[in-house]
Amino acid sequence: MINIGIDVGKFKHCATVLDDSTGEVLIKPFFLTNNRKGFDLLYSKTKQFIHRKHSVGMEDTGHYMINLTNYLLDKKFTVKYINPRATCLRRKGLGISAKNDRKDALLIAEMLSEKRFWRSISVRSIENSKFRDITRLYHQLQEQQNQDMNRLQRALDIVFPEANSLSWTRYSKAYMKFLSTYPSASSIALEDIRILRKALKTEGRGRQCKVTAEEIRELAKNSVGEDIISIDLEVTSIIAIINTREEQIRMLEKKIEEFSHKLNSPIISIPGISHISGMTILAEIGDINQFQNTGNLISFAGMDPLVYQSGKYDAAHMPISKHGSRYMRKALYQAVFTVCKYSPTFHDYYTKKRNQGKSHRCAQGHCARKLLRVIYKLLSTNSLYDQNHIQ
């Protein structure tokens, strides 16, 4: 086996070639730039190994290896990603205090010898990673949206704290439109009542605002809110950002749902799994065949409980490892909430754990691991969810 280890960087990479059977370094570590010229240099030095049993290894971290991976796959190389935590622990285990690109490239090449440290990358994996970027972007925008909504409420608590006591739906179109025009109590109190009535009118049937102009102006006149122009500007700016981002979120939702219908994955057959949650989990998993069993998948999601035992001491109530993708864990917890609602098996399992004295969050974690076992079975056998076959 010929092992080609590459330590990836932003502007340059370091590569080396190792004969796994003898441990001989066939090509000493050399540097290549992160551009076409550098990629061609790597190919010219390693193309002699394409038709032999070989592996090209890189750490699965960052995004600097994506272009190089695509290039190598086009050239018919066998590419593998190595767990960066494993290389870090191996370096410490060997007592290597020095760290540089050359030593890292050699270490990566050596670690290709052990299957437990790497996963194979194919063209399909790259295509899946592109969809994963879409689902991650969706969740990132949702998180930013929640943060900006909290910022908006903070600002309103200063300039018009009574606003949320009114009977309108918070963050609705009427709510956002009105506040973008009148961001403070002082701006409302001085406005003509007829103009306020017009501002509260919304287009479309069944969307009339329940708040009256008289009601809101009376509150504004007696408001304890401060008249601060900088906060007024902050309110209008945040509302504009929220509205723009909402359009982007809706567009991504549509794209994800279209892809979900096109893919028609068995994961959507699970009661309570939405297109968004299902596709997020699926995008993070990638190729199910890279996992030998459900334990590997649970560990990949960071849902495996930590264990600490030494001699007679055995730590209890240990948390989950939280290794791997936080997006996958978030989607799992969101999905398991509705799955427990619509699936009798999961509902009974959740109730069982609660009756055992488990907290709500702990019981959810047990259900999430059970959900991962079900997902593994459905994806590996390409079968639909059947309530009668779930134990």
Q: Which residues does each PLM region occupy?
A:
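A detector of single, family-specific signature residues
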Residues: M1-Q391
